[in-house]
Amino acid sequence: MAENQNAADQASTLNDERATRLAKRAALFEAGQNPYPEHSEVEDYVVDIEAKYAELADGEDTEDVVKIAGRVVAKRGQGKIMFIVVRDATAEIQLFCRINDMDEAAWNTLKALDLGDILGVAGVVVRTKRGQLSVAPKSATLLSKAVRPLPEKFHGLSDKETRYRQRYVDLIANDDVRETFRKRSQILSTFRRFMESDGYMEVETPILQTIQGGATAKPFITHFNALDQECYLRIATELHLKRCIVGGFERVFEIGRIFRNEGMDLTHNPEFTTMEAYRAFSDLEGMKALAQGVIKAANKAIGNPEVIEYQGQTIDLSGEWASRSMTDIVSDVIGKPVTIDTPVEELAAAAREKGLEIKPEWTAGKIIAEIYDELGEDTIVNPTFVCDYPIEVSPLAKRFEDDPRLTHRFELVIAGHEYANAFSELNDPVDQAERFVAQMAEKAGGDDEAMEYDEDYVRALEYGMPPAGGIGIGIDRVVMLLTNQASIRDVLLFPHMKPEKGFQSGAAAAKAAEAGNTASPFVKPLKPTVDYSKIAVEPLFEEFVDFDTFSKSDFRAVKVKACEAVKKSKKLLNFTLDDGTGTDRTILSGIHDYYEPEDLVGKTLLAITNLPPRKMMGIPSCGMLISAIHEEEGEERLNLIQLDASIPAGAKMY
């Protein structure tokens, strides 16, 4: 209740301040002043002013006129002197405002400013007696009136959901966020320069495709009305780029968006950026050199040392990166030697001992890949090329000549995550056609991520494709690594989010705005949005339990220290919880359809803690989080029980 009241108070305060600012805006228009003028003059930037006048003495004025513009981020003073801090695209600078330095209109403009307004000034460069480099305005122009106030704690907006939904506010409020996206831009530029300097040509391939291919992933499906044709947003650029190799281009690359209709977690977003590159007359060794070269170049471009810190781990990017076979890593994980010749029964038994679920139809290669994915990848810290993938999980890679069960493929793994995937490309059209047929059989068996048969691609291979190496690098993950960000959302300007509760868009928003006669609706007071007439709940149990039985159930308040999606699971979230004992508790819960993991960090939840441990996806789950479930218009709805934050971890519930 206290939490709801606090939110309601904040909404009321926001509405009051916004109304005041809207009134100021209206008054300006009534006075014949446009608070959103078309023209502005900016000739100088703060960072250049700081460099040029670094030696200016304390208390010294110049006659040098500069013209700057920026957002008002601080304001103080009264009477005949005011101090205003503005921020432009490069840095912040103080405006030393003296009433005698300007006309009355300019002074009134400065007096009426609110935090967040965008201001243009012309003035002279001075240094105050206290040593603060400043601009003393001679004229001032309001360039944009901000009618919505900045967050109360301007320097350090911390609520993650607000930061992701309103990235524009996040960029205003947090210097480190702006720096992350500057570095992302530098990394992308470095990738392009590196590739071009190595003789690669950048090309563009279709985003809208008629075949689901190039990767094993679930696509977004749309309809092309003009041709009455079902289409997909691309899940990879691979097959079109290799058509370019067939056509005679020896080195091609593409940096672009990829779309996969799958889950969201710390390292996955439904749309993301990759670089794919293909080089004729090359192989895996050439792709290893490319991966090392471009990532090291990007790391250097943003000013990082060769040894970096990533989420508490020390990563050494220097020297030649290691290469290991997948079977070597799996051997370490299960504690005994494994090869592709190890009997299926033995592999399955070893996997089940580690808590993995193995399907009876799986082959040795599939089981080895599963053990590696679930248990091996996380053990890798420094950059490692994991090589020699089984054919079952590599439908586009070239087979070993001496063992067709293995392929010439590697994944680059750093800090337990994949950053690149590379093949010695399959160029035998008959072999490729057979693998497409096998993929279609898997699709017919219910695997909606399996590739479709691409007849035109097989036809292209029939004309002859030279031996080639190919690689795909996840740009977003590279940015995460080099900027030390834990979540992919922290390196995407506008990550995909679940719909905001109570927030309208499109026609509904326009109708609400028209009804309110404002540019956009005010913050709505908190009120129930559920139509309870359409709710169905499970009937109460008729069987009673005695108090002794009930008292044996240990319900406790727990605080979420960390939460992440479980690999290979679309529903499970892995919670690290503080239960008041001083030892972290792990509980898995199948609620990913309803919650994003990062949104739950810091929350206080209700758990039953004395259930016996139960393995889920190989991870022991010690207890259960309590949720409320009901049906609404035939669909199940789930709400995780969230407690007041003031309740301490470990508090017992009765």
Predicted regions and their residues:
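Conserved RecA-like helicase motor-core motifs
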Residues: 586-587
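An active-site-proximal beta-strand-loop segment
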Residues: 564-565
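Class II aminoacyl-tRNA synthetase catalytic cores and aaRS-like
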Residues: 1-543, 549-559, 581-583, 593, ...
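Short Gly/aromatic-enriched secondary-structure transition segments
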Residues: 86, 572-577
